[in-house]
């Protein structure tokens, strides 16, 4: 950490000497221990180290940024010169700013020393379990890694943050095959600090694998479903909420005043059961953000509480441009409050609808309209899953969807990056051939 501190300190001094009125730097070293598997075989085992140095300088109300992957003196000197040059070519804007001096903090998160033997055993156990218990499932790719990061942040207001974090992660891509029938690829994954629980039992790995086996027998949906209920799995709901985040309350939509909710702060904007936070400090989030590049420690921030819009996830720059208050966290680290019913009961109470595992489509229009393919989906009739669907389409409006919530499950996906329930909605068109 001392090495990173000295690099950050030296770089910041060079940046100010070169003419920056204010700015910040962050020096980081990342360490990755990675296992890859293809089918039953492990194909890669490696450890890599990477350096990163980010610079941001402001001169005459203009901004310049650059990033390099070297700590060599010559590389740093060039990066400083480039940063000042980029600022000189930038557009003048008095809204550029960093936060005043904050209390210096040292952050430590997760496992700073990996148990690689136990981690490898858990990964091997997962591969063996899939091959034994789900013979139809073919592992296309498995990437398991332990990632450690050490960083030092400094700015010209003399705020200094240091951070060390370490976590395990797994990404799994797979399909199912029976005879000549092969499903499309599906995926699952998580970030964790827990090596005591088998990986098949973490996040929704088991549910996702079982779901792909059910996809071996698919049928096309004919026509439209009238007055359908669409139940989004947690992973799919995270997709839809990310679209909502960007279109309705995100940085660019607020800055450009294209947000449909621009004048709705403090107003009810969706179903009262929706409470949506960005929560890097939640204990279920693994190694969440600790501070912003503008020089302030982050805190959990509620954007929507009981359906009421409480804040926009914007930067200090956008806050200065618009007059809205910048929250303590403007990243997408979603934690959505769970409901009271089980997903089993929600399905039982659904007369006509579909369960959607993932969504494939373009980015929604500026007004929130969306249209795309409902992938890994199932038809629901009279309270039960009937069969897997192929080529089903869903279309609607994100705002209307969240204003027509049928129910929210008590079960949640906790994969280290989010906490998300199943959410059932109306006002969505479901169509087949």
Predicted regions and their residues:
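Acidic low-complexity segments
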Residues: 4-13, 20-32, 77-163, 196-238
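A generic local secondary-structure boundary/capping motif
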Residues: 13-15, 42-46, 127-134, 156-164, ...
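Structured beta-strand/loop patches that form or line metal/cofactor-binding pockets in enzymes
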Residues: 20-53, 141-161, 352-374
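N-terminal alpha-helical targeting/anchoring segments
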Residues: 32-88
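Short beta-strand elements
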Residues: 46-59, 161-191, 303-305, 374-381
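Short, acidic (Asp/Glu-rich) active-site segment that either coordinates a divalent metal cofactor
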Residues: 62-63, 171-202, 267-273, 309-331
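Amphipathic alpha-helical
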Residues: 250-269
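Dual-mode signal for accessory low-complexity, basic/Gly-rich regions
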Residues: 264-433
């Amino acid at each position: 950490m001392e090495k990173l501190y000295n690099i950050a300190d030296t770089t910041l001094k060079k940046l100010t000497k070169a003419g920056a009125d204010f700015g910040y730097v962050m020096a980081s070293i990342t360490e990755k221990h990675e296992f890859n598997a293809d089918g039953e075989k492990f194909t890669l085992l490696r450890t890599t180290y990477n350096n990163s140095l980010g610079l941001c300088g402001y001169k005459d109300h203009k901004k310049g940024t650059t990033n390099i992957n070297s700590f060599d003196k010559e590389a740093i000197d060039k990066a400083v010169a480039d940063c000042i040059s980029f600022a000189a070519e930038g557009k003048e804007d008095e809204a550029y700013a960093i936060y005043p001096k904050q209390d210096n903090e040292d952050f430590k998160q997760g496992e700073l020393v990996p148990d690689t033997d136990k981690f490898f055993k858990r990964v091997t156990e997962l591969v063996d379990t899939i091959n034994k218990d789900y013979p139809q499932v073919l592992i296309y790719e498995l990437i398991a890694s332990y990632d450690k990061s050490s960083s030092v942040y400094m700015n010209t207001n003399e705020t200094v943050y240091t951070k060390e974090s370490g976590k395990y992660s797994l990404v799994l891509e797979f399909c199912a095959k029976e005879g000549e029938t092969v499903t499309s690829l599906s995926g699952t994954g998580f970030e964790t600090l827990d090596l005591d629980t088998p990986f098949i039992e973490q996040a929704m790995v088991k549910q996702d694998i079982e779901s792909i086996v059910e996809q071996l027998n698919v049928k096309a949906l004919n026509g439209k479903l009238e007055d359908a209920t669409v139940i989004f799995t947690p992973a799919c709901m995270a997709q839809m909420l990310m679209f909502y985040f960007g279109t309705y309350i995100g940085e660019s939509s607020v800055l450009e005043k294209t947000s449909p909710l621009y004048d709705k702060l403090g107003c009810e904007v969706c179903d009262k059961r929706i409470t949506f936070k960005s929560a890097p400090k939640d204990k279920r989030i693994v190694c969440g953000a600790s501070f912003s590049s503008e020089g302030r420690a982050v805190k959990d921030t509620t954007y929507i509480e009981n359906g009421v819009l409480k804040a926009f996830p914007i930067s200090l720059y956008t806050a200065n441009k618009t007059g809205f208050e910048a929250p303590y966290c403007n990243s997408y680290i979603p934690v959505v409050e769970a409901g009271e019913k089980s997903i089993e009961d929600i399905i039982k109470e659904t007369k006509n609808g579909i369960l959607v595992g993932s969504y494939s489509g373009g980015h929604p229009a500026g007004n929130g309209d969306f249209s795309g393919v409902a992938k890994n989906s199932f038809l629901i009739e009279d309270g039960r899953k009937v069969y897997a669907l192929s080529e089903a389409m869903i279309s609607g409006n994100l705002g209307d969807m969240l204003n027509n919530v049928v129910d929210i499950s008590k079960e949640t996906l906790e994969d280290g990056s989010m906490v998300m329930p199943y959410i059932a909605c109306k006002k969505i068109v479901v169509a087949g051939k």
